[in-house]
Amino acid sequence: MAAATFWFVLRGWRTGVPPGCGLRRLSQTQGTPDYPRFLESVDEYRFVERLLPPTSIPKPPKHEHYPTPCGWQPPRDPPPNLPYFVRRSRMHNIPVYRDITHGNRQMTVIRKVEGDIWALQKDVEDFLSPLLGKTPITQVNEVTGTLRIKGYFDQQLKAWLLEKGF
């Protein structure tokens, strides 16, 4: 008890406030602080908008002839009448990718498949069989909408999907 009293007295001595005086009462007696005034300007917000990332990917511009110099081609306006659909990526490219796992397992992945993915697998096997001389090994994932093909066939499959109208 004596130690607690000693600390209260010492605290009052350090802060210059007697031990019984409430700090809340002292802070309320002072007036509200005068904050500096500010001016709200909306004219300069256009400079801030240039720094913010866009909220959505813009639509690709229209060109006179396709394919463009970089090789990009838009999908056909009426989508192909097939039981499956391969949706473009967010940058408007065909979602066919190369994948390598375990150091040397080379795979080609077709993503964003909607509809009957098994029909796409059969069409891909029919397309790649003459190129390979045998039926390619494929893996279908219905939940994620992906089709994996053993080997690198990304360029051939991109051209084939463009020809189909995706």
UniProtKB/Swiss-Prot annotation:
GO cellular component, one term: mitochondrial inner membrane
UniProt keyword Transport present: no
GO molecular function annotation: structural constituent of ribosome
Claim: Protein biosynthesis is one of the keywords in the record: no
Gene Ontology biological process terms in this record: translation
Chief place where the protein resides: mitochondrion
Subcellular location: Mitochondrion
Cystine pairs: none
One matching Pfam family: Img2
Keywords for the protein's UniProt record, in alphabetical order: Mitochondrion, Ribonucleoprotein, Ribosomal protein
SUBUNIT field: Component of the mitochondrial ribosome large subunit (39S) which comprises a 16S rRNA and about 50 distinct proteins. Interacts with OXA1L.
Protein family (similarity comment): Belongs to the mitochondrion-specific ribosomal protein mL49 family.
Protein name: Large ribosomal subunit protein mL49
